[in-house]
Amino acid sequence: MKTTARFGLALASAALASSAAFAQAPASPHTVTANVSLGSEYIFRGISQTAGKPTLQGGFDYAHSSGVYLGTWGSNVSWLEDFGAYNRSSLEWDFYGGYKANFGSSDFFYDLGTIYYYYPGSKNPGVVSADSWELYAALGWKWVSAKLSYSLD
């Protein structure tokens, strides 16, 4: 009888130990993602940025479970050269960060942040830089949102 009890105790201990070995690690509060796309044209706020030509775009994003996020994104553009503003400049490089959270436990959310649009390259004489800062605020529900952006320039 003692042998059976010991065997049962050993079997139960082994079962518990093996289930602990397969336990899932806690989810990280950090998320890093990347994206890339090839498009037929880059249109921003109703204005073509590539004059009807294809676009290659991509970026990296970091998000923390607290709601804080940072990212960078880039795309080819042609409008700087098309309008004679810059020489040999075909890149838009954006840097952004903000805070996004839900209202309580609902599906409604808000997003507050800033974005810097950077256009590297040499400007022609007398041309004002196309680089600009924006502040934005968005309200949304699940997959739909409305966003208001304000340029600081």
What is the predicted function of each stretch?
Residues 30, 52-56, 89-93, 108, ...:
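Residues that define the transmembrane beta-barrel architecture of outer-membrane proteins
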